[in-house]
């Protein structure tokens, strides 16, 4: 069986839900950017058409060129529920690590909830620091009928965020990236029994 054909089933869809049906007060809300009314995250996900589900795309890249060459971490979720992961670190002569797996609909649904709950679709990167010699990070998301593409410098800590011209917006991206990286490292680690850097 190839890596592409492998499917990760972390839990049933009912176990993946953050909110319980018994307590509607726990439902998180996200502002629908296409209209002025506020909808729950679940309502927004329920209104997705099949084409919008197929068009969902998320890509994150962080990297720099330094003493060891071009070092980077990149992952993306593509149509067909594919997760592609690449980690290029030349430290101690390590080689490029590339992995590809298929994830369940429940995992993709949770990623969409994380995106909606973060509020990243409402942000703008015009006041964020430009990529520089420290490095570069990019976040691209296609979700429903919206497409965002952000580019900024590599951010090491919340201190870097606080020093920026848009600390609130950059903080949204910082925390979203931390959540996504934890999820991706867990998925890759669980599946391949490796320790992603």
Swiss-Prot record:
It comes from Dictyostelium discoideum. Keywords: Nucleus. One of its GO terms (cellular component) is exon-exon junction complex. Residues 28-42 have a biased composition (Low complexity). Belongs to the mago nashi family. Transmembrane segments: none annotated. One of its GO terms (biological process) is RNA splicing. Residues 1-43 are annotated as: Disordered. It is found in: Nucleus. Residues 1-10 have a biased composition (Basic and acidic residues). It comes from the Eukaryota. This is Protein mago nashi homolog. Its main location: nucleus.
């Amino acid at each position: 069986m190839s890596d592409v054909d492998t499917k990760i089933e972390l839990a049933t869809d009912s176990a993946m839900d953050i909110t319980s049906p018994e307590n509607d007060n726990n439902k998180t809300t996200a502002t629908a950017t296409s209209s002025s009314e506020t909808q729950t995250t679940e309502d927004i996900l329920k209104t997705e058409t099949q084409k919008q589900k197929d068009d969902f795309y998320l890509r994150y890249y962080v990297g720099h060129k330094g003493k060891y060459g071009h070092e980077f971490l990149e992952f993306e979720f593509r149509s067909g529920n594919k997760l592609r992961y690449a980690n290029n670190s030349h430290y101690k002569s390590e080689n490029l690590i590339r992995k590809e797996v298929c994830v369940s609909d429940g995992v993709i649904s949770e990623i969409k909830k994380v995106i909606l709950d973060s509020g990243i679709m409402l942000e703008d990167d015009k006041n964020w620091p430009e990529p520089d010699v420290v490095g570069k990070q990019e976040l691209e998301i296609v979700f429903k009928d919206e497409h965002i593409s952000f580019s900024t410098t590599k951010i090491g800590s919340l201190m870097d965020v606080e020093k920026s011209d848009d600390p609130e917006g950059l903080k949204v991206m910082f925390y979203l990236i931390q959540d996504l990286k934890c999820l991706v490292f867990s998925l890759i680690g669980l599946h391949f029994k490796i320790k992603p850097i």
